[in-house]
Amino acid sequence: MAMKRLLLTLMLLGTSLLIFAQDYPFSVVKSGTGKQAVIFIPGFACSGDVWAETVSVLKDSYTCYVLTMAGFSGVAPEECPSFERWKMQIAKFIKEERIEKPILMGHSMGGGLTLAIAAEFPELTGKIVIVDALPCLMALTVPDFKSAPDNDCTDLIDRITAMDEEQFVQMQRMSAA
């Protein structure tokens, strides 16, 4: 009987590990077993660990899925990362894992992703919680700012990816000041 339990446990563990072995552009840490799911999406360059305190409070009542996006905090980078791909892949994750109407909680860039997912896939999402998401910082300081949705950000991406770790940290500190 003990051997059967051990085999069943190993099979379930293996299956649960395969669930998150998909080709998503983010890592997922699952905790809690509540009926309602919450998906936590961190901000730019942040680890999902920024949600640790919140998850510690909610995991007794909710099933928590904490994402860390590709290229941040030890998650392998993508060759061509994009907001659009991340949005579509998070929606795919919700569908494939059969997560019913999760609460999406996003900070900064994660807030933008949360809004985009809820707008495009309202049938997939329950409630949304947005923490400090600013859609366009330039619009705050330039009164006649006009949106240009087809901006080519290649130069900016090249400059950021060419930075060493210290330069990147310094840039983050300057933007937070």
Where are these regions (language model features)?
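Alpha/beta-hydrolase fold catalytic core
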Residues: A2-I39, K59-Y62, E96, E100, ...
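Conserved HGGG/HGGXW glycine-rich cap/lid loop of the alpha/beta-hydrolase fold
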Residues: K30-A76
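Active-site loop/oxyanion-hole signature of alpha/beta-hydrolase fold enzymes
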Residues: Y65-M105, M109, E120
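Short glycine-enriched nucleophile-adjacent loop
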Residues: G111-P122, I128
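Alpha-helical elements of Rossmann-like donor-binding domains used by nucleotide-donor carbohydrate transfer enzymes
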Residues: S27, V50-E53, V57, R85-F93, ...
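Flexible "cap/lid" loop of the alpha/beta hydrolase fold
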Residues: A119, K127-E165
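Active-site micro-motifs of SAM-dependent methyltransferase domains
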Residues: C46, G71, G111, P135-C136
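Alpha/beta-hydrolase
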Residues: E166-A177
